[in-house]
């Protein structure tokens, strides 16, 4: 959900967005929608988080629990470290996981259950902006400490924890004439915000780590339960997509019509899908609010908001007529190791459709002459990254990062000592 963090939130943009309510944000939380669509999502496990763990994520500094001597599936050069690795035995009692040992144990067990490698996220956001600190420079986590390191280094995760309802109104704040009441007492508003944040049922989502082909991930925009438009998520040019465009659009439209259109509680939302070869099955990756905070990628929000929403004509017939058929003998949902063996078999079948369109959603791809179409080496989320010396240390293996952290600790200790002496 943190995809468009460089843009101010709320209605200050002047764009004619529908009113963004707190219930809309909660409906886009992974823990809310995953049970509904589990059979069409990649394999994942959800771990409820308590206040102690959330306080750990919010706390300044990165202190990791002591590392297991031989964590399952971890390489010798994994680059994962604990700040207590080089500490004195007397410091062993500084273990942050003491306050959430059950969660720590659940995370260990879940990593093992999902094959030894997982990709983490919180309710809305994955820590993609923090992969610079990972030894593999991606979301792959083999130990609990890998997960904690990514979560505590991520601005996206901080947004989930501190700003989930920014730009929203409560479901009772909207007046009958459609105008939104504005709180004028800042103290009361701050207190209300803190209370709301504390009521969010935060979860750690651990998804089985698989290598997705980024060229086959797509973002889809829904208004009034109509699929308006869709586009690539990856901003590079892939020539082969143009030959697949019509087939991909049909498959995604059918998936939306049958799976999401009448089952998601809100009429306006944005969803991400993955359509791997042989391109006959659609996987739901994420659901985001139809709001400025969601990155429109190849579109602008002004374009999307100005698109005409297809509606019923005077005769009551829809602009789009579809005849849907369920194909027998379809592949199981665990093909390519993506799906969940525990999903109900009835929801695993592929869907085919004989389709007649009078409204066709625009499917935007990156053109070959786009000046930004070949930025394969361009780093993403650069606004959230740290200085070069930190990045270089993270890339030099465990020795380099441990040395950097030791120097960092020395600097912090020296500054604390200077502050104490100055205040004496």
Curated annotation (Swiss-Prot):
It holds the Pfam family D123. GO terms for cellular component: cytoplasm. GO terms for molecular function: ATP binding; magnesium ion binding; protein folding chaperone. Residues 85-95, 338-351 have a biased composition (Acidic residues). It is found in: Cytoplasm. InterPro entries: CDC123. ATP-dependent protein-folding chaperone for the eIF2 complex. Binds to the gamma subunit of the eIF2 complex which allows the subunit to assemble with the alpha and beta subunits. ATP binds at residues 121, 124, 126, 128, 207-208, 217, 219, 233, 272, 286, 288. The lineage of its organism: Eukaryota, Fungi, Dikarya, Ascomycota, Pezizomycotina. GO terms for biological process: eukaryotic translation initiation factor 2 complex assembly. Belongs to the CDC123 family. Keywords: ATP-binding, Chaperone, Cytoplasm, Magnesium, Metal-binding, Nucleotide-binding. It comes from Ajellomyces capsulatus (strain NAm1 / WU24) (Darling's disease fungus). It comes from the Eukaryota. Residues 325-334 have a biased composition (Basic and acidic residues). Residues 64-95, 325-351 are annotated as: Disordered. This is Translation initiation factor eIF2 assembly protein.
